[in-house]
A protein has these predicted regions:
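Recognizes extended acidic, P/S/T-rich segments that occur
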Residues: 47-84, 137-177
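Pro/Thr/Ser/Gly-rich low-complexity, intrinsically disordered linker/stalk tracts
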Residues: 2-44, 82-83, 95-135, 171-176
């Protein structure tokens, strides 16, 4: 004879934890800031949450969430004043068990100020882009000439420098009689 004791087997199914959570872009577009988040589609993500800090990362507030997102996901933040203030962003995802997992890196908007007291010389100054995992290698200064709607690179600036002077006289076009 043989006997078996009472046995019960439990199997728990856990959703995968996203392995990729990256805030790829924080762009100022006129009076709006566009924040782009790269996540993993099909990794059990139920919700995405966007957080913003307007006090240099001391505290973050939930500003947007979306259910069943598809990635890449871009959120447009209209509650900003990008001409006078820099903001920091972070994104998280919620799994099917309502756990907040997969926190992203922190992205920062760049506040650019222009001293245009001189008609021809323009002085640009900006805040450092902070909290990038490997730091900033360099900044690229782009200019837009009214005759050409696309931006063109006018300088590469070392990452420790947050100031650039440019003589826009080279962009002034003299009319001619043809």
């Amino acid at each position: 004879y043989s006997s078996l004791s009472n046995q019960i087997d439990f199997y728990a199914l856990q959703n995968p934890i996203p392995q990729y959570s990256y805030l790829s872009n924080v762009n100022v577009v006129e009076d709006t800031i566009e924040v782009t988040y790269q996540g993993e589609n099909g990794a059990g993500v139920k919700e995405v949450r966007f957080y913003k800090s307007d006090n240099n990362g001391i505290s973050y507030n939930l500003i947007h969430n979306d259910i069943n997102p598809l990635f890449p996901y871009t959120y447009k933040d209209f509650s900003v004043d990008p001409n006078n203030h820099s903001y920091m962003y972070q994104v998280s995802v919620i799994d099917a068990c309502d756990n907040e997992v997969g926190f992203s890196n922190i992205g920062t908007s760049i506040l650019l100020s222009v001293d245009d007291d001189d008609y021809v010389m323009k002085s640009l100054q900006w805040n450092a882009y902070r909290n990038w995992e490997f730091g900033v290698d360099h900044y690229e200064v782009l200019a837009n000439v009214n005759l050409n709607p696309s931006f063109q690179s006018i300088a590469i600036v070392d990452s420790t420098n947050h100031y650039f002077e440019h003589d826009i006289g080279s962009f002034i076009v003299e009319p001619f009689n043809g």
